[in-house]
């Protein structure tokens, strides 16, 4: 089954981007490259069970097995040793990436309390967009009764756009609800 968002990108979004920014070829039009989900679990240093729960939740949200991230350096103030497991991340590409973005835009973000749109200022100057989610409960896969702790996660949307303006246009046309 072809992905709804991918089809929308190919049939509507890409042609309108080519027209708006006057690209010389179809391949020059910006597209989504990957989406990285990251959950930092700082308290995993004291209680490793917290990390297992975060990994399981991230797996449910993304539909693939997360990679456990480890500390690069020891920091005494945080009681952290080099090599300790302190978080989990997932990199989505291809069909799963489009599925996740579709779900994020149409299901999860509207479930955020007092949601007025995502920030317009979270671009990094290279055409990538970063978004923080305060609680994992906005995702339909997470069962409220099984959650013992509210955790947030970072979502980074990496595009091939050369500028923030192009990336903003790409995401807006894919349905990202930017704040007015």
Curated annotation (Swiss-Prot):
The keyword Signal does not apply. This is Large ribosomal subunit protein uL5. Belongs to the universal ribosomal protein uL5 family. PANTHER family: 60S RIBOSOMAL PROTEIN L11-RELATED. It comes from the Bacteria. Keywords: Ribonucleoprotein, Ribosomal protein, RNA-binding, rRNA-binding, tRNA-binding. Pfam families: Ribosomal_L5, Ribosomal_L5_C. NCBIfam families: PRK00010.1. GO terms for cellular component: ribonucleoprotein complex; ribosome. One of its GO terms (molecular function) is rRNA binding. The gene is rplE. Part of the 50S ribosomal subunit; part of the 5S rRNA/L5/L18/L25 subcomplex. Contacts the 5S rRNA and the P site tRNA. Forms a bridge to the 30S subunit in the 70S ribosome. This is one of the proteins that bind and probably mediate the attachment of the 5S RNA into the large ribosomal subunit, where it forms part of the central protuberance. In the 70S ribosome it contacts protein S13 of the 30S subunit (bridge B1b), connecting the 2 subunits; this bridge is implicated in subunit movement. Contacts the P site tRNA; the 5S rRNA and some of its associated proteins might help stabilize positioning of ribosome-bound tRNAs. GO terms for biological process: translation.
């Amino acid at each position: 089954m072809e992905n709804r968002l991918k089809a929308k990108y190919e049939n509507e979004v890409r042609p309108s981007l080519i027209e708006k920014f006057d690209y010389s070829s179809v391949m020059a039009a910006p597209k989504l490259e990957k989406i990285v989900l990251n959950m930092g679990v700082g308290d995993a240093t004291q209680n490793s069970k917290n990390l297992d729960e975060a990994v399981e939740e991230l797996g449910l949200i993304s539909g693939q097995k997360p990679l456990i991230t480890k500390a690069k350096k020891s920091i005494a103030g945080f009681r952290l040793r080099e090599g300790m497991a302190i978080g989990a991340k997932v990199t989505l590409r291809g069909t799963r990436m489009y599925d996740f973005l579709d779900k994020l835009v149409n299901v999860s973000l509207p479930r955020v309390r007092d949601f007025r749109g995502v920030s317009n200022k979270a671009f990094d100057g290279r055409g990538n967009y970063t978004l923080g989610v305060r609680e994992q409960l906005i995702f339909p896969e997470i069962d409220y009764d099984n959650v013992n702790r509210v955790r947030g996660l970072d979502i980074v949307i990496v595009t091939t756009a050369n500028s923030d303006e192009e990336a903003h246009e790409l995401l807006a046309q894919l349905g990202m609800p930017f704040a007015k």
